[in-house]
Amino acid sequence: MTKKAKRNIVHKRFDSIVKGSQDTKKYRGLELTNGLRVLLVSDSKTRVSAVALDVKVGHLMDPWELPGLAHFCEHMLFLGTAKYPSEREYFKYLAANNGDSNAYTDTDHTNYSFEVRSEKLYGALDRFAQFFLDPQFTESATEREVCAVNCEYLDKVNEDFWRCLQVERSLSKPGHDYSKFAIGNKKTLLEDPRTKGIEPRDVLLDFYKNWYSSDIMTCCIVGKESLDVLESYLGSFKFDAIKNTRKERKIWKDSPFGPDQLAKRIEIVPIQNTGQVSIKFPFPDLNGEFLSQPGDYIAHLIGHEGPGSLLSELKRLGWVISLEADNHTIASGFGVFSVTMDLSTEGLEHVDDVIQLVFNFIGFLKSSGPQKWIHDELAELNAVDFRFDDVKHTMEKASILAECLHPKIRKNFETALKTSHHAFNLPEKNEYIPSKFDQKPREPVKSGYPRLISEDEWIQVWFKQDNEYNSPKQGIMFALTTPLVAKKSKNVVAFKSLDTIIEETYNARLAGLECQFESSSSGVQIRVFGYDEKQSLFAKHLVNRMANFQVNRLCFDISFESLKRTLTNHAFSQPHDLSAHFIDLLVVDNIWSKEQLLAVCDSVTLEDVHGFAIKMLQAFHMELFVHGNSTEKDTLQLSKELSDILKSVAPNSRPLKRDEHNPHRELQLINGHEHVYRHFQKTHDVGCVEVAFQIGVQSTYNNSVNKLLNELIKNPAYTILRTNEALGYNVSTESRLNDGNVYLHVIVQGPESADHVLERIEVFLESAREEIVAMPQEDFDYQVWAMFKENPPTLSQCFSMFWSEIHSRQYNFGRNKEVRGISKRITKEEVINFFDRKIRKGGAERRKLALGLWKK
């Protein structure tokens, strides 16, 4: 065991840290002699360690002559240090130890984080610490990484969210830091400064030396080691030696929205097919009000979706599709409260009326006054979540934003603020808030896997009681197999209207019940996960609403307008999202394109929707899986009640015949052949090349070797294609399991031509093979061990994993155990042979499908 550092590096200690009653982790707070604040978390059960360091400097501190410098500094910091000069060292170490990393630049802080196998925390922390002790910022990397930032800028420049945000910043108070251009690009970081005689690298070095000061840094380390050992690491890697330049955490005392910026109506023409109105109020920074959380209270009431709510009335009038209320601290010292609504076509003709109703509702809340029972209900929900927190690595929770609305508002709506509206009411009490958290009686049959406890021609019932997590939660998965859904594109669209059922689940979602309602070529799936006490009641409500689905004309019109807008806007998605969709269309049987669904939207009537559930239930089969804090008896009772609901709605229905099941199928590509497809998009200035290698039919062996191969080439792909060749900002490799087949994907999104990128991907694959060949046996063996070492999943993950086996009809619940067995036998020669046969150019079993997506 590593001994505690001999020198005294700690200035203050904080041991009385409040935690949830079910939290077994140990915590220690420290302030080092250089002012760095550290939270240590000892979790003896974890297999993955995590570290995050936050520097209180963001893009609001950019020098005016170099917009985007803080973001550029975040990019450059990773590219080598004095102790580890190789630009790949940090990423290579993490990749070899099944780790990952992330970083982002915000308004007033920049965050760096990584995770790694717990046994390798020591080495990862050593490499991580060097970024804040002695980074290189080499000249050779400077221009190359500017290109990477520019690619990131090009990725976002045609997204409506970023366009609107930049308009908001540009129209803020002149000279206020909020008006700066945050992301940066080649023009702001390289071309313009050099035109003015400014060398960007020199300014970058000054920025780092000035702002990367230990007294405005915080760090969290989560590991399986004891608190004393974790503390010793701080001394071993000289965290106390990070320079303290005596910086103060900057606080902006003035809002970027002064009298000249308020009471303004700004109209923006979107790229996507959308209509939205957002009302924003300057808000103070209320991060210190975490005990009362006034901002969350207001957002809860304005954003509520139940009867008597603002959204309910706006929907009744047919003006609004959705509404979100959010309180947000922009940076230390100032924030904003926003009410954002997606408008229907009718709503676009009534924008002023919509705004007036918002102010009416605010006036109603003001006249009603604060309600203690609502505050207590929110506190109760937070207390339950804190007690049974499923998050493995506890980090500092999001701060509470905002307290009160700014008094300076547009005069046109002052009268509305002073009056209420007859349709408004405070929300009803939430019937789904759980109060019982005890464990259900233990079943005499203890099994590590789901058991089939009942089966007939109508339904299969699977059950597994939780014996590992002792959690008051469970999952319910209900699948209704009916081939009618995917038979026609019109049926798929009609089914989509049933998604409005999810809009009625607001209280359940507030109470911690997750809900998903999905259609597929085989039928319908309803997934519910959360606290078990009210879950069966909720599941029965959902199935009953689906079977007896009725919706009024106005709701139908709004729902279908929303659906059409979603289908239309798919064409404006990021190129890498579009390429994934197009590849699925090429290889998966019996699925519909967004264009095909959009084409039939106008032909679907309200009568079609009302009659669809009955038609869907003419012939069907059910599967029910319950996993968690439940009993076999309760599960069988639930299965009976769900069956009774469906059979009562369609008394003349019949069980589905086995040959009527409609599983997904995929095309089998031909060995030795490659197919290249070209497609176009009209929105983004960057394109995407996605290369998919069809490995073959899913099997434990194919899945395992392909997953390992992906891990071996993931880091080289990022380094070679993104960092060295600057082909794009979004570069990744993925091992994917589709419907029956396993694939290896290489994805590059950037400004280069498709032909050039395809050529460079082939060159990269050859380089990646050479790296595997040259990899020392010890490193390969460790990579295999780290890749397949057992890592206990959460209850939710376990539930999803078991359901995947049931729904795919593979029933291999011990697959992970089989994978670990295979991993002990995999050799490097085997992986190289696998690569040569299935990936390498000229391979006997290579099946390559490439898609180039470019701007018209």
UniProtKB/Swiss-Prot annotation:
- For this protein, the Enzyme Commission number is 3.4.24.-
Q: Gene3D superfamilies from the xrefs?
A: Metalloenzyme, LuxS/M16 peptidase-like (3.30.830.10)
Active site, UniProt feature: 74
Molecular functions per Gene Ontology: metal ion binding; metalloendopeptidase activity
Name the residues that bind Zn(2+): 71, 75, 152
- The name on file for this protein is Putative zinc protease C28F5.4
GO cellular component terms listed in the entry, alphabetical order: cytosol; mitochondrion
A GO BP term, please? peptide catabolic process
Is Hydrolase there in the keyword field? yes
Report the PANTHER family cross-referenced here.
INSULIN-DEGRADING ENZYME-RELATED, NARDILYSIN
User: Pfam families from the entry?
Assistant: Peptidase_M16, Peptidase_M16_C, Peptidase_M16_M
What EC class does the entry list?
Answer: hydrolase
